[in-house]
Amino acid sequence: MHLFKGAMTDSERIPVIIGVGQINDRPEDPDNGLDPLGLMVEALKRAEADTGVTLLKKLDSIAVVDQISFRHLNPLDAKLAEALGATPAVCYQSDAPHGDTPIRLLNEAANRIGAGEIKLAAIAGAEALRTIAGRLAKHATPQQDVFEGVRNEAKREPGYAQQHGLNAPVDVYPLYENA
């Protein structure tokens, strides 16, 4: 999770990462595990603590990476803003969870700060695949043989990367190395 801050004058519109936070949630009982929203809230609180100042309620922008482990919670962007007590002017969730999505959201936030559209942004993403798998295994019935937590019934149009055969991280990372 990253927090960014920019300022009003052109010389101060240089985006800077001012706080980072990460959480690895591995409780013995999967029923005690955090869902993606809980993970993002905790990670952003850690990012705020990393800055040494109170910022989360002042966010101008929240961008969330789409998640697959708790699909019924989507979209999470407005829920995250509410959980943080923030009312950002820019609040959205990516259309799909891809390996390059966090860096794309980071780039978009930096561009908005540089353009003077926003001053403070948060980028967040979380998966709770271990938690959902553990819960399903713990509460499984003989008829449950499908991992419902990651089933995505939504039909999506392929994005630019997919139209060009860039479907897996191994396809995309060489582009970064050669950029």
Task: Pin down the residues of each PLM region.
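Conserved "HGTGT" condensation-loop signature of ketosynthase/thiolase-family condensing enzymes
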Residues: 2-96, 110-115, 122-179
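Conserved phosphate-binding catalytic cores of ATP/NTP-utilizing and phosphoryl-transfer enzymes
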Residues: 103-111
